Design a protein with these regions (language model features):
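Helix-to-loop junction immediately C-terminal to a conserved catalytic motif
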Residues: 52
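Q-loop/switch helix immediately C-terminal to the Walker
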Residues: 83, 88-104, 111
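Conserved ABC transporter NBD signature motif
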Residues: 57-75
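Conserved ABC ATPase signature
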Residues: 89, 128-135
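Hydrophobic anchor residue at the start of the ABC signature
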Residues: 142, 181
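Catalytic Walker B motif of ABC-type/P-loop ATPase nucleotide-binding domains
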Residues: 153-157
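Conserved ABC ATPase "signature" region
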Residues: 97, 109-124
Length: 206
């Protein structure tokens, strides 16, 4: 039986007076992903941010490896928001290096260059991010996924602004992450062609 990594029980959140969701319960085991679906405004991003500890819930509890979230949880988390966390004044390579450094991941330069090659940014690695398209900025985040060893990925609309080739690479990267025992929580409008025994669905606003 796979290790239970994340447990969410009785979660509820409001936006002002409006109730976004309530009584949300789920678990995520090693080697599996949960895809959160729902219309715009249903609370998908709020749910992800609440799980990560970035938004305080109105009710409920989130536990990691059977305990309250703390430094250990933050050290094992990779959060990718709806907009890529890219600094305009830094190059693609510098942004990647900075993101990995903040995560405490020591990655040799040759591996960073290989990841930038995989995502089609190697020849643009020295360009300031402000000169990159939205899709290219998303590819920096994809390169981080390839390199970051964090076991738990929380990704908000990870396929947005990626072309077909980059989407396919992201899905292969996610599949490999799950195959080696990682876990993921995703908010997405897309059907993810991953093994059915690895992916479950949660619909908000149904």
């Amino acid at each position: 039986m796979s290790e239970r990594l994340l447990e969410v029980s009785g979660l509820a959140c409001r936006r002002g007076p409006a109730l976004l969701f309530e009584s949300i319960d789920f678990t995520i085991e090693a080697g599996t992903a949960l895809c959160v679906r729902g219309a715009n405004g249903s609370g998908k991003t709020t749910l992800l941010r609440t799980v990560c500890g970035l938004t305080r819930p109105d009710a409920g509890e989130v536990r990691w490896r059977g305990a309250a979230r703390g430094e250990a949880f933050r050290g094992e988390l990779l959060y990718g928001g709806h907009a890529p966390a890219v600094k305009d004044e830094l190059s693609a390579e510098e942004n990647l290096h900075a993101a990995l450094g903040l995560a405490g991941a020591e990655v040799p330069r040759d591996r960073m260059h290989a990841a930038l090659t995989d995502v089609g940014l190697f020849t643009r690695r020295a360009l300031p991010a402000r000169r990159l398209s939205q899709g290219q900025r998303r590819r920096i985040a994809l390169a981080r996924l390839i390199l970051d060893p964090a076991p738990f990925w929380v990704l908000d609309e990870p396929l947005t602004a990626l072309d077909d080739a980059a989407q396919a690479l992201l899905l292969r990267t996610l599949d490999a992450h799950l195959a080696r025992g990682g876990a993921a929580l995703l908010a997405t409008h897309h059907d993810l062609p991953l093994a059915n025994d690895r992916v479950r669905q949660l619909r908000l606003g149904a």
